[in-house]
Amino acid sequence: LLNGELRNPENKSQRALYDAMKEIKLRIDTIENKLDFLKAIEKLEVMEFVEDSEGDAIRIFQTVNDRGKALSNTEKIKSLLIYFSNKYLQKKYDDKINDAFSNIFELYDDIKQAGENLNITLFKNKEFNEDNIMRYHFIAYFNDNYDPTPSYILKHLKDVLTEFRTSQAYDKIEKFISNYIQTLESFFTSLKKILSRANTNEKYFKIFSILQLSATLYPLTVKLETLDKLDENYKI
């Protein structure tokens, strides 16, 4: 980008950078005295706050979030898990949680783009985001609510972890966090695989693109994929 090479973006983050760069170039072109503008930019000061601990950094980020956009429930869940790992598990899972969610956000971008390319109404909806997939995962792996809101999921996870903390069952906190991030990442991966298959498999294309599989069936369908039971011969 800095060399003026605007290559075709491959994911959501790259598309955002691409669009921002185009907008910046457009605005700069309208400035009459570019030298004065450059001198003004050089006077700007950037305040840097360095925090070596990944867990502490995320806790600070959630507390002083000022990016102009509210945190999604998925981001809040990530922060919650890192908080419990950081404070009660000697930071054992901080990096694992961070890596898992980094992958999850990338998988979501791929899922969203694939769904739109396949003309699936569910994924084309502007309101659809990673929180929707978090709901599907919750329905597939928890038994206490089959129509949870994103805020309900966050509260449920917080209640479970708080209960373990109160009883000082730190081994249960570790087991819960480990299982949750493993199944969550696997769930996002499986959904991406299903949509990728719809590009090459006629039956999957018909089910997802033409017939538009009901949103209520996604939790079951994706879980079957994670269990390797949703092969080409399986009848949905």
What are these regions (language model features)?
Residues 4-236:
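Polyanionic (Asp/Glu-rich) segments that form extended negatively charged tracts
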